[in-house]
Amino acid sequence: MSRGTMPQPGAWPGASCAETPAREAGAAARDGGKVTAGAQPRAATRCPAEHEEDMYRAADEIEKEKELLIHERGISEPRLSVAPEMDIMDYCKKEWRGNTQKATCMKKGYEEVSQKFTSIRRVRGDNYCALRATLFQAMSQLAELPPWLQDLELILLPEKLINKYTWIKQWKLGLKFDGKSEDLVEKIKESLALLRKKWVSLAAMKTAEARQTACDELFTNEEEEYSLYEAVKFLMLNRAIELYDDKEKGKEVPFFSVLLFARDTSNDPEQLLRNHLNQVGHTGGLEQVEMFLLAYAVRHSIRVYRLSKYNTEEFITVYPTDPPKDWPMVTLIAEDDRHYNIPVRVCEETSV
């Protein structure tokens, strides 16, 4: 898709590929030559066309891994959602040591990215990965506060929408809020208020170093971090409702929204919530077409180096394809279409 094409429905993760558990620790390595630490079982996507590794796991596996990590490093050490930066080619050599066709493709992809960026930050690969990588990049950039966050109506949005669309009460709160009998409207209002508060604080910082340090700290606070994801998911639902209503009224809408509501599992916003957004963070991540919706929700264009698509027109994919000129851009790296890492430190000799 690179700079002008859309991913076809058959290429979306989840459109035609069944997710099955990889019951042997070495399954991922056999699949493409990638070295995985700790021999932890993962859920793997087995697509007939590409057989790409799925970095996502079930919620209970994620919690077990967290307990193990806490036990190993001690409870006092903060959990890292976004790892410290390291040289991008050192990371590639560490992760892709094999000589399989996939490993070779990944190495060439990383070599290409290294012409633009010198370092990488690994993002924790749970079912919030796409949200985490995008939001971390957007909030850590030295830029002004986005205008949409300054809208006084933002915090009133949950009450307004839930009063109009009672089916939103089907909303499934994230992992950190399971089992809590909090009022849904109040919980989402709190999440949106937190998103605004943290972004305002970061935008007021004068140096990139100060902003980066504060953002790193924010993404080690699990309760606040997961609350931010609830806010972003609600913003995604709000944009989906707006786009669906415009489409029903015959107004011109972005092409991705036509595809979004053409799926059997998301013919309307209610189905999108029940079958897709409610699963994000629990049993699934964002599909390709939902990356467009994420971009529209936070009003940032998302440029992704899709390493598995090296040497094709889809190697660099931008969501949306033709973003408004005033939208900031975040850049991510994807080894597959589910897990995203963050490239950092632009090479001085490039303008990208």
UniProtKB/Swiss-Prot annotation:
Domain OTU, first and last residues per copy: 118-346
Source superkingdom: Eukaryota
Site keyed Linear diubiquitin binding: positions: E314
Gene Ontology terms: biological process: innate immune response; negative regulation of inflammatory response; negative regulation of NF-kappaB transcription factor activity; nucleotide-binding oligomerization domain containing 2 signaling pathway; protein linear deubiquitination; proteolysis; regulation of canonical Wnt signaling pathway; regulation of tumor necrosis factor-mediated signaling pathway
Deleted gene: phenotype: Embryonic lethality. Specific deletion in immune cells leads to acute systemic inflammation characterized by rapid weight loss, increased levels of pro-inflammatory cytokines in serum, neutrophilia with all the hallmarks of emergency granulopoiesis. Specific deletion in T- or B-cells generates healthy mice with no overt inflammatory phenotypes. In contrast, specific deletion in myeloid cells results in a strong inflammatory phenotype, characterized by chronic inflammation and autoimmunity, caused by sterile autoactivation of inflammatory pathways.
UniProt KW keywords: Acetylation, Angiogenesis, Coiled coil, Cytoplasm, Hydrolase, Immunity, Innate immunity, Phosphoprotein, Protease, Thiol protease, Ubl conjugation, Ubl conjugation pathway, Wnt signaling pathway
Compositionally biased residues, Low complexity: 18-30
In-chain residues carrying the UniProt-annotated modification Phosphotyrosine: Y56
Short motif PIM motif, span: 52-57
Region (Disordered), start-end ranges: 1-49
Short sequence motif PDZ-binding: positions: 349-352
Reaction equations catalysed: Thiol-dependent hydrolysis of ester, thioester, amide, peptide and isopeptide bonds formed by the C-terminal Gly of ubiquitin (a 76-residue protein attached to proteins as an intracellular targeting signal)
GO MF annotations in UniProt: cysteine-type deubiquitinase activity; cysteine-type peptidase activity
Subcellular compartments: Cytoplasm
Name by which UniProt lists this protein: Ubiquitin thioesterase otulin
Organism name: Mus musculus
